[in-house]
Amino acid sequence: MARKKHRKLFPTLASETNKTLDCSNGVCDPICPYNCYPEPDYYTISPQLPPWSSSPQPSPCPSPSISAVYLPSQDSSSSLDAISIITITGAVLAILLTGFFLVAKFFSDSVNRVNQGTYQSDNEDNDTVMEEEFQDREQVDHPIWLIRTTGLQQSIINSITICNYKRGDGLIERTDCPVCLNEFEEDESLRLLPKCNHAFHISCIDTWLSSHTNCPLCRAGIAMISVTTPRYSGPVEVTPGGSGSHLENDGVDEEDHGEIENRVDSDFKESDDSDIRIEIYRFDSDGDGSETETKERVRVLKECMDPNGGDSVNSLSHTKTHVESVDFPGKSCENQSEEFTRHNGEDEASCSEENGGGSNQLRRSCDSGELNGETTGDEGKSQSDISSSTLKTNGSSSSVSCFNKNKSSVFPL
C-alpha cells in the first residue's frame, strides 16, 4: 500500500530541512517538528496503547519554578507579621492607658483628702473663734430672726397720718422710702410717723408695723398709750370671813402715772385677832421698760368689849370702812410705818350710847381722831391724812351696854 505523503502547511519552512535545531533544552518551537524531523506527524500523534497494557502512567509534571513556589509563601508570612505587630502594639497601649488612669485617680483622691482636711481644720478654727466672740459678747443661743415679735393693731396703723409728698416743702426730709429704697413721686400718698416724722410708703410701713411697734429707721415708738392709775377714794366694804371676804371699790380717782402699763392687784386676809388686812399692789411701768412696784396695806382693827358677856360680835358682822385718798411714795413708806406705830397709842375712839325717852332705839356714834404724820426722807416730805367714817351697826331692840372701839388705819409696807 502506497504511503500517503502529507501536504506541508509551511512550505517556506519545509525547504529548510537541512537546518536542525536543538530541542534538548525542552523549549521547542511550534514549527520545530516540521523543521527537525522528516516525519513530524509521527512525533506529534501519540501512539495507541496496546490492549494488554495497564492504566496509562501519568506523565511527569514539570517541576514548579522557583518564583511560583517562593512568592506565595513570602506574602503569607508578611501578613502574619503585620497582624502580630498590631496586636502587640494595641495591648501595650491599653496597659499604658490603664496605668495612667490608675495613677491619676490615686493622686486626685490624695489631693481631695488633703483639701478636705484643710477645709475641716479651717472650719473648726472659725467655729472656735466665733464661739469665743459669742462668749465674750454674752450673746444668746437663739438667733434674733427666731424671736417672734408682736406688731400694732390694724386700727392703730390706720390712725397714723397720711400726707402727700411735695418736693421742697420741708415737711419730709428724705426723698426715698427707707424700707424699699424707691424714690418718692410728686403728690404720692405717704404715711408720716407721729414722733420722728419719718415718711414711708403706705404698703411698706403697714407691713413693717404689723410685726413691729417702732420706726424702722430710728427705732422710735409709734403709739403713745396713756394709762391712768386708779386711786381708791370711795368706801371699801369689808366682810369678815377669811377666804369668803371680798373687796368693793365704789369710787376711783384717775391720775396719769405711766405711759405703757399700770396694774393694780389687791389681796386681803383675816388674822387670828380679827384684824382684817387689805394689801394693794400697784405696778407702774415707764416707757423705758423699768417697772416700779408700790405696795399699800389697809388694816382694819375690830375690838368689841361686852361686859355682860353677850354675843355682841354678831352685831358687827358687817362693817363698812371708808378709805380716803392715800398716796405713799416709795421711799417714805418706812418712815410712815414708824410714824403710825408711834401715834397708834394716841389714837382713841370714844363711843357713847344715848337712849332718849326710854325708846328702844340704839344709836351708836363713833368719832375718831385724825392721824397726821409728817415724815422726812431722801426724796422729800410725805403727809398722810387718814379719817374713818361712822361705824354703823344694827343691834337688837333691847338696850345693851357695849363699848365698841373701831380703829381704821392705812399704812404702807
Swiss-Prot record:
Residues 238-258, 321-413 are annotated as: Disordered. This is RING-H2 finger protein ATL54. It comes from Arabidopsis thaliana (Mouse-ear cress). GO terms for cellular component: membrane. It is an enzyme of class 2 (transferase). One of its GO terms (biological process) is protein ubiquitination. The RING-type zinc finger domain mediates binding to an E2 ubiquitin-conjugating enzyme. The chain crosses the membrane at residues 83-103. It catalyses: S-ubiquitinyl-[E2 ubiquitin-conjugating enzyme]-L-cysteine + [acceptor protein]-L-lysine = [E2 ubiquitin-conjugating enzyme]-L-cysteine + N(6)-ubiquitinyl-[acceptor protein]-L-lysine.
